[in-house]
Amino acid sequence: MESNGVPMITLSSGIRMPALGMGTVETMEKGTEREKLAFLNAIEVGYRHFDTAAAYQSEECLGEAIAEALQLGLIKSRDELFITSKLWCADAHADLVLPALQNSLRNLKLEYLDLYLIHHPVSLKPGKLVNEIPKDHILPMDYKSVWAAMEECQTLGFTRAIGVSNFSCKKLQELMATAKIPPVVNQVEMSPTLHQKNLREYCKANNIMITAHSVLGAIGAPWGSNAVMDSKVLHQIAVARGKSVAQVSMRWVYQQGASLVVKSFNEARMKENLKIFDSELTAEDMEKISEIPQSRTSSADFLLSPTGPFKTEEEFWDEKD
């Protein structure tokens, strides 16, 4: 366990990752001094795992915060941090994977990543990030060649490990059929209102660590939901345990054997989020949470197309499998 109280998880490749990380998606302060200071503050209060992506447009501010943290002595070495970034869909082509990773490294001012993930199981026509993706730009991903390029990134030392995000069991099976280096992580939505039981069991059987996003319902994001934070079941457990609803939700995820990333720019909540490892939910608590109605918050609508690989949410998530 780290000095900040966050347990370390050993991934199937042997590298160690903090069980809790700070997410950097959908900030209202993109590219601002406030965003950089929030990341710097997170390092100061004890966060050592940061989750970013090319699509989040937060890499540069995070890189500046890391550089400043080193200058201030908040950390002695970049090696104290675990940095995850993600390959955007427009770069999910065999010849663009390595250049995309190298661009992320330039943004972050780092020599290597700890973990590089394929952001979504779909490709787009090459090009810059756009607010609205034209439907005719959505393409099927060649898992074999794209994953081989991800493997090359690891072999060359630009990332210590590779994984995926938003992959279903079916899509993981297809990718792993030709993989030489298996994915160590699958980052997906998971919370008391989306248990992901089948996917968790599949990933556990294949030594893939689930990292949960949207643990609190992604409140504030366009696709967000209040279902977690307004849950009467979670509220009752929180009162009984002397914890917040957020802490109960996060603790539930951790007790399922998953790691997690959460986002807050509020210092008090940053500190609160770190304090989920000092007590356990009881078997009775877990049973109550198992009965919470299930629904998905994340939407893949922006990656659906009548002419693309996935025409419906059900096809994208393989929810009818």
UniProtKB/Swiss-Prot annotation:
It comes from the Eukaryota. Its EC number is 1.1.1.247. Changing S279W: Increased neopine yield and enhanced velocities for both forward and reverse reactions. It comes from Papaver somniferum (Opium poppy). It is found in: Cytoplasm, Cytosol. It catalyses: codeine + NADP(+) = codeinone + NADPH + H(+); neopine + NADP(+) = neopinone + NADPH + H(+); morphine + NADP(+) = morphinone + NADPH + H(+); neomorphine + NADP(+) = neomorphinone + NADPH + H(+). It holds the Pfam family Aldo_ket_red. NADPH-dependent codeinone reductase involved in biosynthesis of morphinan-type benzylisoquinoline and opiate alkaloids natural products. Reduces codeinone to codeine in the penultimate step in morphine biosynthesis. Can use morphinone, hydrocodone and hydromorphone as substrate during reductive reaction with NADPH as cofactor, and morphine and dihydrocodeine as substrate during oxidative reaction with NADP as cofactor. Converts morphinone to morphine, and neomorphinone to neomorphine. One of its GO terms (biological process) is alkaloid metabolic process. The active site is at Y56, H119. Latex secreting cells (laticifer cells). Expressed constitutively in all organs with highest levels in capsules. Restricted to the parietal region of sieve elements adjacent or proximal to laticifers in roots, stems, leaves and carpels. One of its GO terms (molecular function) is codeinone reductase (NADPH) activity. Changing L129F: Increased neopine yield and enhanced velocities for both forward and reverse reactions. The lineage of its organism: Eukaryota, Viridiplantae, Streptophyta, Embryophyta, Tracheophyta. Belongs to the aldo/keto reductase family. Optimum pH is 6.8 for reduction (forward reaction) and 9.0 for oxidation (reverse reaction). Disruption phenotype: Plants silenced for all codeinone reductase proteins accumulate the precursor alkaloid (S)-reticuline at the expense of morphine, codeine, oripavine and thebaine. Optimum temperature is 28 degrees Celsius for reduction (forward reaction) and 30 degrees Celsius for reduction (reverse reaction). This is NADPH-dependent codeinone reductase 1-2. PANTHER family: ALDO/KETO REDUCTASE (PTHR11732). Pathway: Alkaloid biosynthesis; morphine biosynthesis. In yeast (Saccharomyces cerevisiae) engineered to produce opiate alkaloids, the expression of COR proteins leads to the accumulation of neopine and neomorphine as major products. Residues 299-321 are annotated as: Disordered. PROSITE patterns: ALDOKETO_REDUCTASE_1 (PS00798), ALDOKETO_REDUCTASE_2 (PS00062), ALDOKETO_REDUCTASE_3 (PS00063).
